[in-house]
Amino acid sequence: MIDKVYDSPAAAVADIPNGASVAIAGFGLSHRFPSSLVVALRDQGATDLTVYCNGLGSQGAETAQLLAENEQISNLVASFSSRPGPPTIAEEQIVAGKLTFEVVPQGILVERMRAGGAGIAGFYTEVGAGTAVAEGKDVRYFDGKPHILERAITTDYAILRGYRADRFGNVQFRGGSRNFNDSFAKAARVAIIEVEEILDVGELAPEDIDLPGVFIS
């Protein structure tokens, strides 16, 4: 049986190249971000990244903001980029034209990832119809209501955070980490996860497995 445990976060992200697309799970200011992997990716130095995330997280914390601060991101696809308070470095880069930004409603971002993992090319939704989100997208009417076409998302890599995992990569999530990790992992060609505890194979009960090891690299 394959042992999927890396010796260090640095080893886990060592192969991420310049120009890669990376989905980064995490919710809120810094809750359940894969902090160790984000720091390792910053130190690894890959540039021209396309990053998909709910948000970059708070500045000054070990979140995806670190990659923006290190000027490693060229394209950002997220549910939001700003928070109350002084502009973040990422926001300054967007205004200056150094960083392209696509806003995607939170639920739609997850569903586009889920569709990508399921092999579904796209779907129609009412969310965003009649707003700036709909610009340039196909519009069709269902039951008399406009729906816009949202294309599926697949990525080269996903970096995630879980609660526990066994050495085969079966993962248990806890709390808010269930929100994005599953869909992000399935949409990625390579999914890398950091956890609080590593178990031997068989120690994690089947009913506690939220993401099967087949989706983890």
State the predicted function of each range.
Residues M1-S217:
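Conserved alpha/beta enzyme-core scaffold
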